[in-house]
Each structure stands twice: as structure tokens, then as C-alpha cells.
Amino acid sequence: EIDYMAKPNSSPFETELLEAIKISQSRSVQRDDIQWIPSVSNGFTDSRFTRELGVITYGFRGTHPDDNPNLENVHGTNENYGVKSLVSSTKTMLGVIWELCNPVI
């Protein structure tokens, strides 16, 4: 018998939020050939609380395609993240806010 600490959950893939992320990521790295692949992580996240409330929740890294993914070590020993990835992920998050809130502003 499996003793779950939380109910398994997921968010739909084709959403307004994901479209805003795609647009913003493309702009932040100045490329329109980025391929998007949904995946499942074995990590633990607070999304178990937000999804229960009906909030679409994604894990998103925003890694820059020119940074070496083999050097990225998030949440591990000698944790590091490429500078280009830090800049592009920050631009992407700001872009997502703009895309989603633009009609309101």
C-alpha cells in the first residue's frame, strides 16, 4: 500500500499561462525555435496547495539555450546557475506578468 504525503496532481498543458511563458521566453532569449516538452518531476512542491484551489501551477526554469546545462546544479552541492539563464529567466517572469496583466493596465 502506498502512503501518499499529498494527492498526485497536475496542471493542464495548453493554457493562457503557458502561452504567456512561451511568448516571454522567446522574447527574452531572442529565439522563436524553442521546443516545449511537458514533464513530470519527482521533486516536492507547494503546488499541491495551489492546484487544490484551482490555480494552474507550473515548474519553470527559463534556462538560456546558450548556457551549458551540464554546469547547472540547482538545489545540489555547489549550487550554481548560468548568468545568461538568470537574466533570461528574470526577463521571462517579468514578461509573463506583462502578457497576463497587459489588458488590465
Predicted regions and their residues:
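Metal-dependent amide/peptide-bond hydrolase catalytic core
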Residues: 1-94, 98-105
